[in-house]
Design a protein with these regions (language model features):
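A glycine-rich dinucleotide-binding beta-alpha-beta segment and adjacent secondary-structure elements
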Residues: 1-61, 67
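Internal hydrophobic alpha-helix adjacent to the cofactor/substrate pocket in enzyme cavities
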Residues: 1-7, 74-90
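Glycine- and aromatic-enriched mobile tails/lids
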Residues: 58-63, 86-90
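A conserved FAD-binding loop/helix module that cradles the flavin
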Residues: 60-79
Length: 90
């Protein structure tokens, strides 16, 4: 609370710590750069050798835990990165 008051907050709503959360959607996957941050490989549209390998690629949350999907995408991404490095494109 002291931190909020120090920066001028007039109201704060403390919440208990969460046992776990799934933070999603901050680096949206998209076909076109104007619609998101990364392509289908998790590669950023503007920096060819920068990849995002977490749940932030998801455009929205699903009904189930995203961990296995995140792992699957990361494995697929690792194969793609290895292939691109072998070709000298990144």
């Amino acid at each position: 609370m002291a931190l909020y008051e120090a920066v001028g907050a007039t109201r704060a709503f403390p919440t208990p710590p969460y046992p776990s959360t799934h933070n999603l959607g901050t680096n949206r996957m998209s076909e076109k750069a104007q619609d998101g941050v990364v392509n289908k490989w998790g590669q950023t549209h503007d920096i060819s050798n920068l990849f995002v390998s977490d749940g932030s690629q998801f455009t929205t949350g699903a009904a189930e835990n995203p961990t296995l999907t995140i792992v699957s995408l990361a494995i697929r991404q690792a194969d793609y990165i290895a292939e691109q490095m072998g070709q000298g494109t990144i």
